[in-house]
Amino acid sequence: MALFAKREKPPVVDGVEKDERVLSWADTSDGGAVVATSRGVWWPGSDEHRLIAWQHIDKVVWRDGIIAITEAEVVDDLLVDRHPVSALLDKPRDLPPVVRKRVEANIVRSEVLTVGGGAVRFVARRVPGRDGVHWWARIEPGTSDTETVRAAISARLALLRAEAEGSR
């Protein structure tokens, strides 16, 4: 066993900024790579990688060699889940635990408000490269998206954001 083992170099991904640190990567079964950086997860596509920012990763599942990531799209301050993307990892290295740790560390606070016969979840998350936290809302499944619900969301987001701004 060599005292100083040669470290593998991460794959080159177009779009990665000069000050962006590669945290981990994994080789996929189709010859691509999933790369985790300080800004998020670079997901392989047909032509190029695309960035899924840490603050937009809603859910990560690692099972049977497959990593699946559900990205949330922001629409009018609401987090709306996109369809999950998944990849079979040939060589996962430490990518799954690194991604899990980063996603968990990104969520600062979460609370649920009962409104309109349903519920809305409010989530404060860190945004890489910005100070403080940013609040978003997610209408929980089974809750109707009505004017009453939207008004409650707007009021609560304004209060939470004012509190966050005051604590900086």
Where are these regions (language model features)?
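Eukaryotic intrinsically disordered, low-complexity regulatory linkers and tails enriched in Ser/Thr/Pro
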Residues: 1-168
